Design a protein with these regions (language model features):
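Short, flexible active-site-proximal loops enriched in glycine and acidic residues
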Residues: 81-92
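Short, solvent-exposed loop/turn segments at secondary-structure boundaries
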Residues: 63-65, 101-106
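Alpha-helix N-cap/helix-start and coil->helix boundary motif
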Residues: 14, 93-94
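Alpha-helix boundary/capping detector
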Residues: 77, 107-108
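Conserved small/polar residues in nucleotide/adenosyl-binding loops
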Residues: 110-112
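Acidic, glycine-rich active-site loops and adjacent beta-strand->loop/helix elements
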Residues: 55-58, 94-102
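N-terminal glycine-rich phosphate/pyrophosphate-binding loops that anchor nucleotide-derived ligands
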Residues: 1-83
């Protein structure tokens, strides 16, 4: 990877993101059992496989017609599991919280 700093291009799903994943994360954090590069990975737990995935979303505005970033995150993540043939039972949390976000806005997005 030629870049010396992370840019927005590294998060857009294209070539720069692939280079970042392959040359930084996969190279240094490789795990052959998890290295399937799919939306959901099978993990053997106590003799039974589960499918695990986590996803991250950013969108502006945080609330939009028909939903908000919270509903987008839940539906996007459970969709990754469903298309892999799993029945979603649990969710992991991957939160990108911008500096200056009002706590009330955060609470409204997670429905507390």
């Amino acid at each position: 990877m030629q870049d010396t700093h992370i840019s927005l291009a590294h998060g857009n799903g294209g070539r720069y993101m692939r280079e970042l994943i392959d040359e930084i994360f996969a190279r240094h954090l490789a795990n052959p059992e998890l290295d399937v590069q799919a939306d959901a990975v099978p993990i053997d737990i106590d003799g039974g496989d589960i499918l695990f995935t986590t996803d991250g979303f950013t969108v502006q505005p945080l609330e939009f017609p028909g939903g908000n970033i919270g509903s987008l995150a839940v539906h996007g993540t459970t969709n990754d599991l469903a298309v892999a043939g799993a029945i979603p039972k649990y969710l992991s949390l991957n939160a990108f919280i911008e500096e200056g976000l009002a706590i009330d806005v955060l609470l409204s997005l997670i429905h507390i």
